[in-house]
């Protein structure tokens, strides 16, 4: 009741409305952990009790009631709400929300009649396995998750908080793009977000989880982060949509084909993991974070490990891995799983440029980055896509002081006009630049082929690798035996043809002689080009010992503002 004794009707009010003479009954507590009651008494907003009651009412409107409505909408689509996604991502009960009471200030197009608390994004901090992370999650049930002035400010604020605090930031995107009612104000926030992404790059890990659409300017934020996770049949990313493309170019393309999760995981290389569903996407992000430090100055996470320095039966299986025929493939994952602790390897971009494998593992409980040629895909050759995939990974590992282990079996660069015309020289040079610039511990093991320029590019000693080892099956040369025969033994081949000899047999004999006399790893070892030749079974232990010796590595680049990588 009011002071005059009139019964007042409960209603929600905007902040600009006069303070209502409302209060909550003793059982009408609102807020975290409180029971939602009914309004029966008159509050006195000039008293502490009345102000607390008003806070509870506003919290109910901003969080409790808003979340109930969001669940109804999102669950009908088989999706989680923005807050549910955060709760699944962080440790139970650890999330602390920021800015849940902010509201947009737009009055155009009737926007002043719809000013929900929190706007279109939920931000805050929580923990993942006890480690603090900053999080923002766009709310598609509020203005389609569109970015406006206030929601943009919320995202920028949490990004700046993460940078100041030195903690990773994870963005969960589900947005229709810029809020057209706010015009340039919305666009300007994209620019500020991009700048914040760039300033944070190499300082704190940045992970983007795409849970819905991301169009126009919204796509460049994730592209500036370190890892992009997309959900199959749910996520889309594109600069211009199918309708615009149809109008301008006449091309008829669907949303999934244009910018779906599968497209960006297999063709464009924008995404780093194709998740089956939202749970899988969040689980991958949590697992990924377990390999990364909080920031570029922090120590790597270390886990207990029962590392065995004696050769095991599993180690000995590597002695029979390499086929006798140099042209017969094998799966490089077998080697990786023997090298890392517990055979646990988190692959990054497994569907893009599969001829090179990158990802994270642990050796003696410490994180390492793995880069390896894949002989079972395109014979392990390097091409533009593989070079760019690996170079970006090298630079990430170097930025966060994650040691790099390189496993080499590369016959060379993929030949062809398509590669040459699309810039294999310039784009292939990125991997050279990345390795040569890296100051983290670099350990390289040559398993089989290491031919030509591709050998130099793949973490060679000449580019600065600290420890270079080789298996006895390694072949290190300008080119393989078959290619060398065509150049070095052209006369002998011609004479064999004229004499009616078995040319194929002659070629094989000459190729074998070249392989033995020129490509043998012992020749490279004699000249100090590699540091040792090891039995395959000793690979795991040899890598562990090398990394242990390099823990105190100190290396500095010449003073400069920044280099000019061949972008």
Q: Which functions belong to the PLM regions below?
A:
Residues 1-23, 27:
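Short, charged/small-residue-rich alpha-helical element at the C-terminal edge
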């Amino acid at each position: 009741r009011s002071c005059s004794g009139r019964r007042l009707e409960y209603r929600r009010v905007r902040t600009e409305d006069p303070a209502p003479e409302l209060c909550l009954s003793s059982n009408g507590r609102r807020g975290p952990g409180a029971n939602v009651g009914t309004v029966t008494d008159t509050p006195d907003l000039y008293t502490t009790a009345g102000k607390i009651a008003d806070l509870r009412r506003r919290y109910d409107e901003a969080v409790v009631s808003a979340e109930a409505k969001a669940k109804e909408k999102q669950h009908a689509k088989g999706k989680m709400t923005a807050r549910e996604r955060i709760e699944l991502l962080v440790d139970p009960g650890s999330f602390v929300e920021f800015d849940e009471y902010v509201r947009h200030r737009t009055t155009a197009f009737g926007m002043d009649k719809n000013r929900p608390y929190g706007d279109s994004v939920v931000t805050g901090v929580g923990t993942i396995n006890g480690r603090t992370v900053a999080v923002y999650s766009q709310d598609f049930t509020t203005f389609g998750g569109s970015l406006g002035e206030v929601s943009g400010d919320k995202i920028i604020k949490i990004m700046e908080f993460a940078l100041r605090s030195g903690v990773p930031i994870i963005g969960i995107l589900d947005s229709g793009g810029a809020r057209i009612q706010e015009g340039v104000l919305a666009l300007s926030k994209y620019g500020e977000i991009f700048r914040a992404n760039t300033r944070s790059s190499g300082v704190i890990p940045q992970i983007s989880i795409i849970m819905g659409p991301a169009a126009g300017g919204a796509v460049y934020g994730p592209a500036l982060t370190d890892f992009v996770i997309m959900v199959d049949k749910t996520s889309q990313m594109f600069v211009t949509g199918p309708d615009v493309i149809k109008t301008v170019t006449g091309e008829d393309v669907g949303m999934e084909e244009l910018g779906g999760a599968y497209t960006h995981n297999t063709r464009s290389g924008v995404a780093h993991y194709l998740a089956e569903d939202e749970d899988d996407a969040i689980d991958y992000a949590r697992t990924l974070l377990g390999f990364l430090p909080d920031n570029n100055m922090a120590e790597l996470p270390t886990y207990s490990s029962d590392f065995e320095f004696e050769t095991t039966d599993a180690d000995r299986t590597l002695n029979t891995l390499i086929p006798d025929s140099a042209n017969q493939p094998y799966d490089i994952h077998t080697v990786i799983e023997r090298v890392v602790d517990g055979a646990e390897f988190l692959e990054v971009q497994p569907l893009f440029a599969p001829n090179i494998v990158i990802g994270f593992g642990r050796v003696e409980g410490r994180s390492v980055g793995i880069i390896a040629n894949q002989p079972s895909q395109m014979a392990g050759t390097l091409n533009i896509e593989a070079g760019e995939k690996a170079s970006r990974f090298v630079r990430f590992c170097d930025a966060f002081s994650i040691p790099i282990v390189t496993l080499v079996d590369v016959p060379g660069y993929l030949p062809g006009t398509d590669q040459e015309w699309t810039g294999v020289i310039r784009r292939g040079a990125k991997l050279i630049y990345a390795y040569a610039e890296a100051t983290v511990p670099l350990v390289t093991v040559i398993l089989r082929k290491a031919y030509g320029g591709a050998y130099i590019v793949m973490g060679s000693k000449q580019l600065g690798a600290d420890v270079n080892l080789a298996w006895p099956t390694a072949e290190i040369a300008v080119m393989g035996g078959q290619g060398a025969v065509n150049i070095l033994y052209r006369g002998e081949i011609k004479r064999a043809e004229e004499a009616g000899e078995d040319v194929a047999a002659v070629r094989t004999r000459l190729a074998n002689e070249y392989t033995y006399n020129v490509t043998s790893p012992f020749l490279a070892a004699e000249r100090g080009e590699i540091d040792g030749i090891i039995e395959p079974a000793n690979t795991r232990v040899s890598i562990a010992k090398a990394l242990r010796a390099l823990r105190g590595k100190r290396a500095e680049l010449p003073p400069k503002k920044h280099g000019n990588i061949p972008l």
